[in-house]
Amino acid sequence: MDDDIAALVVDNGSGMCKAGFAGDDAPRAVFPSIVGRPRHQGVMVGMGQKDSYVGDEAQSKRCILTLKYPIERGIVTNWDDMEKIWHHTFYNELRVAPEEHPVLLTEAPLNPKANREKMTQIMFETFNTPAMYVAIQAVLSLYASGRTTGIVMDSGDGVTHTVPIYEGYALPHAILRLDLAGRDLTDYLMKILTERGYSFTTTAEREIVRDIKEKLCYVALDFEQEMATAASSSSLEKSYELPDGQVITIGNERFRCPEALFQPSFLGMESCGIHETTFNSIMKCDVDIRKDLYANTVLSGGTTMYPGIADRMQKEITALAPSTMKIKIIAPPERKYSVWIGGSILASLSTFQQMWISKQEYDESGPSIVHRKCF
């Protein structure tokens, strides 16, 4: 497909928005899902201050703005701001006219019906798209790994889901949601670094901690043993240079932070860890398909990028599952963007072209058409 008629693929996450053209192997635009508004009235006349900023620009001006995330825990909660993010995506990032391209959007598993209708309505009425489709994020990740059956553990910035999928269809009764993801881990790292005597409190400093987390954290195969190693030697210590030139040292925090994924009690949460949630999700499925799910457990999303996470999942699920069961954890290197990549694959398939909801169908049926055509 040429760019001039290529479908647009937009994956709206709680933390980052990924956008680009169907058929590409990576998103062209990746920016924070943030809308910022000035805290104070502009002092300098003629500076041409805008009433709102989106993405990286909002991030860089964060000291004078109030930042809002329109997507909370994977679900859109502020539609005015969401519209601003889409506008920014089309006109500033991709530089396309949305009325000339079909648009594939992604949604969280178990997204409320009213939300899908609202997305559909905004695309056709505000942006005048010729056609659109809404796909479930985890299903796209599975497609990106070249499968149609498996269980996806998708963990991003705002929310974690375990989604069993059989022959391309998500099984809603067995989907589980865990409100523990990247943002919570960043907050936890801020807290445990404070215990070491480093103070990180502001939203600007939170971004620094997020960078420390992404560069230095990893998942221990055996937490207790790793703690013992960290206590007895400095072999696990790493240093990090802050923007002001100060150098900080971080030791057991490197694996204590992501350990919260397996032990949510670290964050004061009573829920099960990601390994147990994945197991519970499999157990909610028909006994005949469990074997296929165990053998096709796919990790996706930025919060699954920690080194060591796949080995640890393998170990934990093996301990929970029947002893003869073959368990395979698939962690593709590009899993940070696998939702987007799956969307790019889907939207460029010739067999998918009849699946689009067209403007004409929308005009005839209204927003509820989305439930009949996207499942």
From Swiss-Prot:
Cited Pfam families: Actin
Residue numbers carrying N6-methyllysine: 84
Any one annotated GO CC term: protein-containing complex
UniProt key word Magnesium: no
Enzyme type, top EC level: hydrolase
Entry comment on modification after translation: ISGylated. Oxidation of Met-44 and Met-47 by MICALs (MICAL1, MICAL2 or MICAL3) to form methionine sulfoxide promotes actin filament depolymerization. MICAL1 and MICAL2 produce the (R)-S-oxide form. The (R)-S-oxide form is reverted by MSRB1 and MSRB2, which promote actin repolymerization.
Entries under InterPro entries matching the protein: Actin, Actin/actin-like_CS, Actin_CS, ATPase_NBD
Note: In vertebrates 3 main groups of actin isoforms, alpha, beta and gamma have been identified. The alpha actins are found in muscle tissues and are a major constituent of the contractile apparatus. The beta and gamma actins coexist in most cell types as components of the cytoskeleton and as mediators of internal cell motility.
Protein family per UniProt: Belongs to the actin family.
Protein's recorded name: Actin, cytoplasmic 1
Organism this protein belongs to: Camelus dromedarius
Gene designation: ACTB
